Amino acid sequence: MRRHTHHKHSSRKGYRRLLDRLAAHESVHRVATGRVKPRMGSGRPIAPISKVRRVESGLSITINTEGAVIDAYVVTDKPEEVAAWMRAEGLAR
């Protein structure tokens, strides 16, 4: 009998494309996803990336989708450059 994998949260193509776009930036070494939490409330996301925080390895970002909030980490040695690029591209506020 075929076994089905239980997915706690669906992985949407929209935020996968966003992560691929971040990973394609020349200053980004790696992009890793963290926790996926259900989105509370009925409000729509203002920007795909709502929070950009500096951490030791680069940047910690929060991605808003229709049904979930995803924490991700952008490993880079030029976090200011990557954060400015995200704002210029309209990905972050």
Per-segment meaning from a language model:
Residues 1-93:
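Short, Lys/Arg-rich flexible segments
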